[in-house]
Amino acid sequence: MRLPIILDTDPGIDDAAAIAAALFAPELELQLMTTVAGNVSVEKTTRNALQLLHFWNADVPLAQGASMPLVRPLRDAASVHGESGMEGYDFVEHQRQPLAKPAFQAIRDALMHAAEPITLVAIGPLTNIALLLTQYPECVFNIRRLVIMGGSAGRGNFTPNAEFNIAIDPEAAAKVFHSGLEIVMCGLDVTNRALLAADYLATLPTLNQTGKMLHALFSHYRSGSMSSGLRMHDLCAIAWLACPELFTLQPCFVAVETQGTWTAGTTVVDIEGRLGQPANALVALDIDVEGFQRWAAEVIALAP
C-alpha cells in the first residue's frame, strides 16, 4: 500500500529532484503540493512547481502558500538556484493554476477529508506548517508524522550555525518543533553527504526526458559541481520515506534559536541529553551514501 503524502516545497533545483521522487517512487502517493517562499519568492516557487507538474503530466493539486516568514523579511537563495529558482531548462507553456485557497487551508482540507492520517513532508521553510498549526491546531491528530529537510546538529550552510530552511523562518520552525508532532529531521548532517556523483550526472541526458531536464537544471545548481558531485538536500526527505533503512536516526530534543544576534535559526540538537528535555524529533545523523545514490538512480529511471 502506497503511503499518502503532502509535499510543501520551494522549488528550487534540488526540489525538482525531490518532486520527481515523490511522484514516481512506488512506495509513495503524492496527494497535494503546496509552495512557500524560500529559495525564491512564492510567486516563483509556485510557477516552478506548476511547470514541473505539467512536465510530468501529474494530476496533483497545488496551493500557493506564504509569501513571507512569520515575522522576518524574506532572504532567498537565488545565488544557489538562479533568479527564477530553476535556471537552465525551458519549460513549455501551460494553463495550470493553483487552487483558490492558501496552502495552510488546502493542507487542512486534505487532512480532514482523508480516511487516515497523512504524512507531511516539508522541504522548504516551515512557514506554511506553522500557519496550519496556528489556525487549525486540531489537525495534529490527522498528521501521521512530519518529515522535514532542515536543521543541523553541527554547522550551518546559511550562517555558521544555521541551515537555510530553518534560518529563513526560525519562529515558524520553533513552533513546529514544539507542536507535539512526530518529526523526522533530515538535516545537513546527512544531506551534505547525499551526493549525486559526477559519473551518474553525466548519464542523465541519455536516461529519459526527466534526466534531460534535471541535467539542464543541475548544470546551474550551485551546491557542489557537475564534476565533483551535487548535494541533494531535499531528496533526502523523500529517500527516508521510501527507504528509511538508508538512514541512522536518534531521538533528540531539538530547540530552535530565535533570539540570538549571531545564532538565530540554529537548531540546538541535544544528542547527549544534557538539557534534560524529552526528545521531540528523530534526527538523521548518518546515511548510507552508496545506497542513497542507488535509490536515487532507480527512482529517476522510473520517471518518463
UniProtKB/Swiss-Prot annotation:
GO terms for cellular component: cytosol. It comes from the Bacteria. Pfam families: IU_nuc_hydro. One of its GO terms (molecular function) is purine nucleosidase activity. Transmembrane segments: none annotated. One of its GO terms (biological process) is pyrimidine nucleobase metabolic process. Belongs to the IUNH family. RihC subfamily. This is Non-specific ribonucleoside hydrolase RihC. It comes from Klebsiella pneumoniae (strain 342). The lineage of its organism: Bacteria, Pseudomonadati, Pseudomonadota, Gammaproteobacteria, Enterobacterales.
